[in-house]
Amino acid sequence: MMKYIFIALCFTAIVLASESDVAKASEKGLTVRGGDMLLDCIVAVLAQIVSGLLRVIIGLVITLSGVLEIVIGVVVLLVDVLAALALDLVKGSVTGICSDFLDFDYVTEYIEESLRSSSAQLLAGLVQALLALPLAVLVALVALTESIARSSCSIGLSECGLL
């Protein structure tokens, strides 16, 4: 809230500075268009707003990368499940023949462990994506308000001759 009050004060300083420049110039017999300075200030603020919006887009791209991580985790999990099902089918048909040569309990334990680790990776990706979106939006909003405040106050101070 204080930032918005600060921005309003800076714009007031810009308007007062442009009015005082017009008054000084009219005393000397010169004509100055005070609206040009205000227009320059508005253009500078709009440029800062665009840069803040670009930061929002960058945050959304980071969030989409988290979503892609989730999709890849789901695909890997499905491949692991299909491999486990295929192994169960093979195990059922070959158990009698190869029971002396292969230890199927070890193989099934390995598949179960890989499924657990894949599901853990999937949950980690989901949590990252869920946390990335609000965080990216908040960071972008903070950067946007700070850039607006910084640019408008720099312009206001330079118009007043304080910078």
Swiss-Prot record:
Signal peptide: 1-20
Coiled-coil ranges from the UniProt annotation: none
Subcellular location(s) of the protein: Membrane
Pfam family, one: HAP
GO BP terms: cell wall organization; sporulation resulting in formation of a cellular spore
Stored InterPro entries: HAP
Gene Ontology, cellular component aspect: membrane
Alphabetically ordered keywords of this record: Cell wall biogenesis/degradation, Membrane, Signal, Sporulation
Main location: membrane
Nuclease as UniProt keyword: no
Family of this protein: To HAP-P protein.
Record's function text: Might be involved in spherule cell wall formation.
Protein name from the UniProt record: Sporulation-specific hydrophobic abundant protein
